Amino acid sequence: MGDKAMPRAARLPSRTLVEGMDRAPARAMLKAVGFTDADLKRPLIGVANTWIEVMPCNAHLRRLAERVKAGVRAGGGTPIEFNTIAVSDGISMGTEGMKASLVSREVIADSIELVVRGHLFDGVVALSGCDKTIPGTVMALLRLDLPSLMLYGGSIDAGAFRGRPVTIQDVFEGVGACAAGRMSRRDLAELEDRACPGPGACGGQFTANTMAMAVEMLGLSPMGSASVPATDPFKDDVAFEAGRLVMALLRRNLRPRRIVTRDALENAVAAVAATGGSTNSVLHLLAIAREAEVPLAIDDFDRISRKTPLLADMKPWGRCVATDLYRAGGVGLIARRLLQARRLHARAMTVTGRTIGDEARRARETPHQAVVRPVAKPLQPTGGLVILHGTLAPDGCVVKMTGHEPMRFRGPARVFDSEEAAFRAIQRRRIARGDVIVVRYEGPRGGPGMREMLAVTAAIVGQGLGQSVALLTDGRFSGATHGLMAGHVAPEAASGGPLALVRDGDAITFDIKARRLDVALSRAELARRRERWRPPRPRYTHGVMAKYARFVSSASEGAVTGTPRHA
């Protein structure tokens, strides 16, 4: 890239860091780690990596980072790589460690922001893999508003067990099946060994793949990049081009807040609805919208989902995995279907310099693919996201509906004040058909950290109760969850929400058509119970968890921390 194509030096933040006599100490330290005078004359591009060797989702990101850096150099820039944290949802699931997961989203965003501000980088490429690294990196890019993009590491390949494809979802459900005597321990051990064959994020339309798709639809990842699997050799080429692309963004001065508009956010929500994506996307897109300073409310998800057909037949509730979607045509095919359904704001801009409509029209569909349905033959006429309100959820809660769940369910409450207590009851087979399992004090403040209930929900499914019980919680659900499950109930129990007042045996009704979640108690009875209710003692009194509990907002606002921008 020639000098004439670059922004004026005065517009590059890095010039303040490395130019002039008084910056000799800074240059000396940069030279100590291998940078040359020639390197420092070029734009400095931060490569924000979330590599970690504790999980497959991010284990290959060092390799991809090298290709990104090569692309930056080819485009005329100097890449500077740094790392931030990551917490594995899948590994920590069902333990106290899971409380760190959602908290890590805020730390990832904060840490990237601090490194980039502290070193005056001119642009950023963020590499993500697991669930919270995707929204965390995007939140940081929007705060910084430098020419930048996010590159997703890609999905894991499906495992193979007894002639059928499997994912980590099957292992979680195998635990429940084993406890119910429906699977032997030997078979579970074999499944454990075969479910995860290598690097990459969990292989269904779970949270990571849902959010990677959403970021492509937002326009902050190059169209076609996210669905390339982690082990596909083409992924290295994608990474190289991402490095080149950030230099083109710098040349055009195209920044994230010009890309992440209201239209772009609605495109992302529509894609989640059309693919039966993770309910975690509600939390994360609300948080992303806040960083972009774009109005987005929880009820917008329901409004968009009502008008969007469910088109993708994907796990956890369907047949196909993420690599199947790649072979069918990738995220571009989803965009194309939404364009055909008139559910796409086609003029929204993307990092490629093309509109999302242009990208949708360029998408190629593999002949005879069976992953993404034609618009005229949807799996169901409305999307997979449903927002309920009612006496138990005045500020809303989130349900994923994919056509297999009952539209109405009424049953007696079985109340548990922690995930562990609920899991023990299920494993000991103390839950009966028709019960409504209530797991509370697991919200953003109460947990703190709003744990995912996959261990609980998978145990329910594994024991054959997936269609005969319901569950509601102020915690979250994994993207691998399926069945009638209401999460993100707000206000949460720890804040005095109605969920805190429920007792064993209270009749709870889910009415999906009416968008209601109610408990059969009079206002007078709820008031009497509220008078006797006392908030529980904080589970953490110092450290990051206590700090998070103090500052985090409601799930209905994205469970974000920090001062609202309008304050």
Q: What are the roles of these predicted feature ranges?
A:
Residues 2-57, 64-85, 90-91, 96-101, ...:
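Catalytic or ion-coupling anion/metal-binding cores of large enzyme and transporter domains
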